[in-house]
Amino acid sequence: MQLMPLLPHVWTFGDLKLDLSQPHVMGILNVTPDSFSDGGRHNQKEDAVARALEMMAEGATVIDIGGESTRPGAAVVEVEEEIRRVVPVVEELAKHKVILSIDTSQPEVIRAAVRAGAHIWNDVRALTRPNALQTAAELNIPVIIMHMRGEPTTMNNLDQYEDVTVDVIRELSQRVQDALDVGVKAENIMIDPGFGFAKNAQQNLKLLQEFYKLTEMGYPILSALSRKRFIGAVLDGAEPQERAVGSATAHLLSIQQGACMVRAHDVKVTADAIKVWQAMQMV
């Protein structure tokens, strides 16, 4: 099966371009002390910048910087602290030719990050925070709208679906419409089905199996499967750092069904897998 987003287009950031008709790797850069698989490894600006540059060399075309953990049960971080963690890293990386995404739900954080040189807003809460929709419209930057129910502290109790794929598409479509209604441009929207957020293992597998149905929404799709717990369960309880190959396999399955970007901790193995898949398409 070969599907790509129904509305492929190019995002342009000055002299940087992101062609969404081709699959890309978004490298994960957590500047948090408590992320589920790499918390505390990149707390210092120098370590974070070094890791970002390493991921670029490994094949990442976007670096996604997060200052708040959204693992199950994670506590909310104060806005000032999130800005303190994120902005210095953005300022330093902005000196390099790299597209920067900010993993935040706080309008104040994305505004500060954009002033520092960030390009994309990746919001796991789908612009539900106060003033988030208006901020997305005003900033006029690409925004990734993800499906989640509740908060990280409550989402594991909100995984009741009649049909997980149908329900995710319906709920995600409503959030996209809410964004359009306040003036967010359709060409600035990317969607993310939210693997691991308010979904159990079987629901995640079904959503991956039916990933192609998300293309019916007509927007570019981000697939964020890296080191997810359900992949560890499939791999007989593998620890997060042992899930690189399983994650890359799942990401390839989503690319085959229409994903144009995958969000990964293990950039090189993911980028290499995509290269092999792309070579196969050329035969």
Task: Enumerate the predicted regions with their spans.
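Charged catalytic and DNA/RNA-contacting regions of genome-maintenance
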Residues: 11
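N-terminal glycine-rich anion-binding loops that anchor highly charged ligand groups
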Residues: 20-27, 54-65
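Catalytic-pocket segment enriched in acidic/His residues
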Residues: 33
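N-terminal substrate-binding region of glycoside hydrolase catalytic domains
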Residues: 30
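Active-site-adjacent loop and "lid" segments of alpha/beta metabolic enzymes
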Residues: 2-6, 14, 20, 37-46, ...
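Short acidic capping loops at alpha-helix termini that bridge into adjacent secondary structure
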Residues: 185-188
